[in-house]
Amino acid sequence: MNNDNIGREPIDVVYDKRFSSRIKPKTKKKKRNENRMRLVRIQHYIYNIFTSFLCLFIVILILYASIDISINYGPVIILYILILELGSMLISYILLQFPFFYRKLKNTFMRARNINKYSHQYRPLYYDNNSFTDENESFNISDDEKKEKRKRKHTYSFMSSDGGRKRSNFRRFLSSYKSKKGNEFVNSKTMKNKTKKNTRRKGFLSFNWIGYKNGETNKNRNDNIVNDVYKKYNDDNKYNDDNKYNDDNYNDDDNKYNDDDILNSHSEQDQRKKKKKKKEKRIVVFPRNDTGGNSFKRESIYIDDCNMWMKKTMRKSNRPNFKLTRSLSFNINMNKDDDLMMKDSASLDNIQIFLGHRSSKFLREKNKLQKRKTSIYNKYVPLTFASSYKDDFFKEILKSQTDGIISSSSDYSSSSEDSNKNVYKTIYINNNNNNVDKKGKIDEEDNIVVRNNIHSNENIIIKENPYSLRNAILFHKEKRKYRKNINTLSDDDNKNFAFHSGKKKIKRKEKKRRCFIKLKCFNKIKNLYRFFINYNMKSSKSSNNLYLFFRGFYIYTKHRFVHYLSYEPIWIVAILIRIVLWCIVWIWAASYMERKPKNFEITEWNMKNVPSFYGYIECTFQWCGVFDYFFGLYFSNNKLKYIFSFFSLIDFITTPVSSLIMNFFVQDNINHNYWFLILGPLRFLRLVRAESTISSCFFWLNDVKIIIIGIIILALAILFTFSGIMYILEAPDIERDFVKPLDFVYFGVITMSTVGYGDYTPVTKAGKFLTMFIIITCISFVAAQFKRLKEAMFSPKTVMGIIPKQDDDYILILGPVSPTQLLYICKGINNSFPNSVESIFLFTPLPVVIYRYVYGSIVKNTNIKICISGGNECFICPSIIYDAVINSRALYILNNVDSEKYTLMYQQIFLASNNINFNNHDHQNQRISSDDILHNNIINKYSKDKTKNWKYSDLFSEYKNEINKNNMLNLEMNININNSYSIKEKDDQECLLRFIGTYNICNSLIPITLQLSNNTYEELIKSMNVYNYISIEELKYALLAKSVNCKGLFFLIINFFYKPKAVKSLKKYIIDLKLLMYNGMLRRKNRERLSSSNLKIKQPSQQKSRKGNLINKISLFFKKGQNHQLDAEGISHDEKNNSNTSRTRGNNRNDHMDPQIKGKGVFEMNQKEQKQVMLKEGMNKNMNKNIIKDMEKNMNSNGKDNINDSINESIEKNDLFFLNSLDPNDDRNIHNLSYKNYYYMLEKVNLNMYYYLEGLKYNIYRFQFPECMRGFLFQTASEYLYQKYSAFLIGIITINKEIFLNPVNYIIGEENKYFYTSAFSGIILTTSLDSLIKLSSINNISKKVYEYNKRLIEEKYKSTFSKSWINSDDDHHNSDHKNFVTNTQIKETQIDGDEVKIVLTSHDDSLHPSDRSVKNRKNSMKSIYNQKKSNLGDQKKKNRNQDDRTEHQVDDNNDSDYLQIESVPKKKRNMYYSLVLGICELENYISAYKDAFVDKDKPLLLVCGWPDNIHMFFKYLKRNVYNSSYRNKNNSNIHTYDNNNNNNNNNNIYSKTVKNKKGKRKKMKKLNDDIKYNIIILSLHVPKFNYENDLFNYSENVVFIRGSPLNSYNLIQAGVFYAKRIIILNSNHSLFIDKDAYRIDNEVIIIKNIVNQLFNYISKNKENYFNLLRKTFPKEYIDITINERIFLNDNINNSPNINEMIKGKMSDSSYDSLDDNYSSDDDSSSSNYDDDDEDNDNDEDNVDNNNDHGGESLLLKKKRKKKNMIKLKKRALNVNNIFNINKNPYLICLIKNSESLEYIDGSINLSYENYNDNEKMNKIWENCGEYIYTFELVSANIFVHEMLHNLVSFSLPISKYAIEYSVIYSLIGIDINEYSKNAQKFHKNLNLSTGYVNLVPIPSYFYKKSFYKCFSYFLHNKLSLCIGILRYIDISSLSNKSKKIFVLSCPSRTMKIEPHDQAYVIAHRM
């Protein structure tokens, strides 16, 4: 099958002659209309031809005149033109940035004062160390620094303000120095002078540390890093017998370089190192005598060194010798034998190796080789922010393995060697040639290789990919050299080579081609050539590549450079500056003009005295004026109108054409400069446009100021024009002394002011007429201008900006759009679709004043022309906006998404209460309860005292009657705190009314987009066929509902619609975040040093004793935290079942608490308990002994540096260490674990923030498939685009907005076979619009990709051919395109060694369907399967009969919903109900699980707040696709043998399988519609009833508890400790009278902190938890039924539940290994349905066997319905499960305004009230949407409502590359497509199916491997597209209690997978 010819065959259209007779003849009216249309077209053509010829004529004329005047001056004019252009732009830049320059100057002059003011913040922290003798009072210097010389530029460590040139800080800190030998005193000045000669200044960031001279300082560590990576640390050489240092000499023989093993770049360094080092004097510090007689050494650590480091690195990031450890002020040459430094050395070494610095570790084997592996993809790994230089050897080695470093050593290796031979290369680094043979071989026995053992807690079967090795070769870019040897080629290549070798011409061409290929620039030029060919925005009919190249280059430069420059304020102001300078030049040159007195002819002026340099200046200005004229003509939409406009005619007159015309009429050969001076006064008229220029560029000026400046400039322009013309006409007048131009300026002022002194009167007629004209003009001018000024000062402004004209390309927006949404829309267009929108016209009823700063920031930072008209509701009436609607490109009708912000803020909501007193004296002591609110009393008629016993017969009717009564009372009283729904509803109605008014005008002309808050009128809008419709509230709650199970989903999707531009601020934010975390740890460390007095510098003899002490400390460390655990063999079966199945991690510090409690419920230990405790202690002792033995072995083998490594291994093997060793009261234990890997954790956070930044660059676009991809399988195309271009192809979209995500079986271009109207487009995630255009312009793809694609398609056809002949013959014509993967069975095998195997098996009988053996085999398999089903059915009938005895009889007419309602009250007849909007109001969490919830095993979802639209949240939570755990598990097992049917019974069997599948689908739908959570709503207020927020359908899963989440007591009552998910909604949580949007956001933030503090409080001490239980659950604590099982049971053996409640077992839900689709909760819930599923299978068989008896089938159906409900009700309350504490629940906060985020993260600057106007405009633009990169939002815990504001910018009318925002619904699993029957058939023919985003675990095999391997695994094995990673990172500096979530979208190919990572994949629906 040739895929290249698909869709290219011509379509033959056949006409039938029978229909020709039916065609009516044309009437006269139709002929007239046709003739008119032809005339209009002809006129249009004539008009276009005329304008084009006129423009061409003007351009040629101006160019001819300009070249004519510049011939005499030569090419120097070009230099002058450049100087003038650049100079004017520089002046304009200074003027535009004047406020910023003023601010910088002010800061520089005020900085000296602030230093003294804040000097206390820069004081160092000191700690004192006891010294042994006076001789040893020196800093210990390591051997690394001893054997290296480094020449430093200046000192940086002590923050000297002069940049290190003056040692002022040294003078304060140290007074003198002492030498080692002669006890010489050396001052800092003398030391500096001595070393100044030997030092060379380099651009390095380095330090001069105390303790040695500059001459003895180290060299660049990067230069010597190859030679000194691992050195032996010799304790014997370090100290003398007299405790003195010896200077080690450098051994040249032992440290030679081998040229074969070391990089050539270090050859120059080798020659330097071969020179002998000279011994120099060592500087020793004098000790300071303490009062106690002991001498102390004081060391300082500056906390604020980090901030200075940040500023320096931000300025100069390419300095190659930057040291992280020195910049962090931590490596201050302290003794490495110190205890504290020893514990931190492991983590420091990881950072040093990670950044390419020298490691401080030393191995005992001096000359061992080290193996390191690098990846071939290291070119894709960018620099991190921590590494600030490029040329670093170790960084190049560790680029791709950044996350693979462990604390044991810097070595690492892959878990598989065979599969990575082609991927990795080995680099050997050594110091000498001892281990290298003559042949270059290496002894592998001596090599040290540390392997990372992967401990997988999952039994995941991984399959081998047969295409994995081919893909790496297929897409890898290799520059292959041409080989002359023919023997190395294949047979086919040999034939081709021999065939071409005989032709000389072909050989020459090949040689030329090889020469071009060798050139580096050739490929780039070739790619650019292709890029410009395919860049044409409009499809061109021409096929000439040269024409297309120039046309594409023209369009690219126009849209990317020229168009952008034309709207830049710098360019516009520069034009104005050149006009002013040009006018000044004329005044200067005109003063040299002479003419005889009383000779008023124009041609009699004498120009001899004019300077000759004036010609150069005038020619330069003339050329600049010509360029300005051409620029305006080029970008004008109506060129004819532009040519004949007033300003254009003035510009045309001032060009050189005027001198050419004057010379043509005046035949005297006069110089061109003559006419330039004569016509020079007209150039002043070009200043008339200054007002519009100032208003568009100088945003900080007020409107009144702009008008005043405009009036002044206009008056000056008229004045100088009139004075100049009068000077040319009347001068000189010697009698009245009017000779110079300035004299006539005086006359002009008198004339324009109509004063008329009479000292001069014009003589000529032209002068008199001109004077009269000016007088009349000025009278009208002054009156009009002053009237305009008065209106601007006293009248409200209704228009802001320039109203677009009829011919302009603009987008019209109607409605009260909030300023923030307008800003988001414009910024989204500018960042994602630059230059796609020319102008925006906004009609709004809101006051225009509120858009002032937003308008200025948009115009200043974008090329978008914006006009805002509004101020009154009548401004957007249909009659007024008719013309604007007709001429627009698209229409957007938007509502006010921030309506509460502008309306509720100014409204007072009154509360009717008897107890509320608003006196000023009593408001502090007054409390308002919920019963005091009149509205709550109305809604909840039945209070606690007056409870009513509800019966089922009266339940439904009385419920509705009470609702109706309460609703009427609400309407009458109109009192409700949460009345935002009415405000939004009113705003939606007004918006809908505007839509109806404009729908009749432009429905068929332009697309309409409608945005509403609620979805009340959704059906009406869909019936009107609106182009785009979005409900903000519905989309918000849909995203929240889908994110409940799929963590971080809303944040992942929103990232696709954002692209932050403030990259510099983001880098600064990441560095600030890192340094804040570092400062917190450093302060803690300094406190410990100040408090500890045992810090001593220990001798080498004392090092041996430290080993034993450390072992004893570790053994004590293990003993401390061990709590009482039951023996594994003695654990009862009930305890195993009731224990929490979620995995516990190292951050659970208090997982097991002691059972002894003081106070009530004290437990006494029985004899059995004591025996168990003794058994556990003995077990723990044995475990500790084994651990200590392992550690001693590691210490003996690897040295003392591996002690921490052995601790790590023991931690991984023994869970007791993590679970029980951390005593919260023991600070030493926390110190040991927190400081161990702290520095490595800092770099890990930094690196992941960088990965997140890279993912933010991706946006979602519409992708037009190139022609070369026709015939590609979607799977091949997605893999190819990601492998080669790092783009994610995730789906396709049709012209009808039908979206299909991950259609694995779709073949690109196959829709043309079925004559589809337009080709499908792709949905792609890529970095920019340019990269998207580059992808759509791909022309050539390698042949291997085509072969790979063909092989994939053939294998899919083979696998599906077996199913095509089983099915009926009716669908035979579609067998080639149907069900590619349905019959493909993937057999998973376990990992054999390090290999991953994937076996694709299909039926062997597919090739021979007529074989009888095959049929017999099928029949035997089918019979076996039926026998198994029948046996299972017999067993289940018995169980069913037993269950039927307990069932009650139900009428046949009752449906399933009625049964669900009836089953509740029959079991709970004595239950008291108080219904609120359809759900029960209960007291606390225990009563909810005891009495209300139907399914007790479901996890808890706590919802804080009750907004008006919460029913939308429950609706989408019920429709959650992620609840389909049953479908995921059983979809592949449904009738696997149904396809193996006998051909004789094919029809009957096929009908049965269809029925069985339909039944399964119905059951799966019912299971999916169920909410998988028990929900508790905690709120103080209840919204008003509006017939939509009725929650009666969710009463089985939802319960209401009245209380405020601001009160911790109410939170505990609602079960905050036991909730798996917590959602804090944006609603009123307090009883304030006013409802401010900002105040509600602040309440959400307060609740978030209260929840976190509650968990911290109970984690500190177990007594705190029990005290809270006694207070919050007093009744349940006394209750016998609960207390006997939990509180008062003394027998531990008989009460397994005590482990859950009393010991406070806390399950960590921060990361679930299988998260929610595979979580234990879903497994438990799905396991409960197993019996029901089997029953249904058996019932379905019975139904099929008894088709003739319809009555029996009906009874079976009814029994099935009853069983499902009865089995749920039979489940008893499992107190064990409901008291499981989720220590780290997933919490989501909903915030309305982004300004409130400042209280969460202080680095976010979102408040602009303290800035002036210009700074406010800049800050608004810079910070708009940039909060999305903050550390809090990365964890997907905060949902900001403003994130949805920019979705309007991603729609097709904006750009043809824009995707519809309806793709969000497809991503979250909601199919909004409505297909007809024909469309469904068409989709089946193309094998189209859509997917959704799901969160799945990543197999442990891929840990520490690149993301690309994981991507290919999911693509080939799971048929899923991986688009993101959910990562957990420990960010706690001093404890291991929690982990932070990182949502990384669109990861890079080389990013390493870490443990516990989960993947966001777009799953494929079968």
UniProtKB/Swiss-Prot annotation:
It is found in: Membrane; Host cell membrane. It comes from the Eukaryota. InterPro entries: K_chnl_dom, K_chnl_Slo-like, RCK_N, Volt_channel_dom_sf. Residues 236-259, 1127-1137, 1148-1157, 1405-1414, 1434-1451 have a biased composition (Basic and acidic residues). Pfam families: Ion_trans_2, Slo-like_RCK. Gene3D superfamilies: 1.10.287.70, Voltage-gated potassium channels. Chain C. Residues 744-762 dip into the membrane without crossing it. The chain crosses the membrane at residues 77-102, 570-593, 613-635, 642-666, 673-693, 706-729, 766-786. It catalyses: K(+)(in) = K(+)(out). Residues 143-164, 236-283, 1127-1158, 1405-1459, 1532-1551, 1709-1754 are annotated as: Disordered. May form oligomers or interact with other proteins. In the Saccharomyces cerevisiae heterologous expression system, a truncated protein containing amino acids 1-1094 localizes to the plasma membrane of the yeast cells, while a full-length protein localizes to both yeast plasma membrane and intracellular membranes. Mediates transmembrane potassium transport. This is Potassium channel K1. It comes from Plasmodium falciparum (isolate 3D7).
